[in-house]
From Swiss-Prot:
The gene is LTC4S. The keyword Endoplasmic reticulum applies. Glutathione binds at residues 30, 51-55, 58-59, 93-97. Residues 28-48, 95-104 are lumenal. This is Leukotriene C4 synthase. The lineage of its organism: Eukaryota, Metazoa, Chordata, Craniata, Vertebrata.
Length: 150
């Protein structure tokens, strides 16, 4: 069982570490711009770091759920790769947003595409799981013909 989900677990742990990094950046920005909790407003430089962290945190549960469903029901490697792309895009998003609101846009779109791909993989995997066995075998046979490397 562990071998079947090791990549998903590694990407999950990397995601948790990335969330911790974002939180530490907010703590650092609070000190640099003298914004004490519970305040969430201050100079624009602080607010951008704060918003970037909050935005990343808001999407993290969606990311985790789709990562695991796609990895278990579709393909672990494909889901893990999409997960890595998503996390890298979120890191770039955070770094860009910390510098300027405009610099967040390209990584935001990249992370959204990766997340939607995970949603699609999860949905396809679940659909295949619930199809009758004969229909599933026929569809997988055709898919293997079209995509021999898969």
């Amino acid at each position: 069982m562990k071998d079947e989900v090791a990549l998903l677990a590694a990407v999950t742990l990397l995601g948790v570490l990335l969330q911790a990094y974002f939180s530490l950046q907010v703590i650092s920005a609070r000190r640099a711009f003298r914004v004490s909790p519970p305040l969430t407003t201050g100079p624009p430089e602080f607010e951008r770091v704060y918003r970037a962290q909050v935005n990343c945190s808001e999407y993290f549960p969606l990311f985790l759920a789709t990562l695991w469903v796609a990895g278990i029901f579709f393909h672990e490697g494909a889901a893990a790769l999409c997960g890595l792309v998503y996390l890298f895009a979120r890191l770039r998003y955070f770094q860009g947003y910390a510098r300027s609101a405009q610099l967040r846009l390209a990584p935001l779109y990249a992370s959204a595409r990766a997340l939607w791909l995970l949603v699609a993989l999860a949905a396809l995997g679940l659909l295949a799981h619930f199809l009758p066995a004969a229909l599933r075998a026929a569809l997988l046979g055709r898919l293997r013909t079209l995509l021999p490397w898969a």
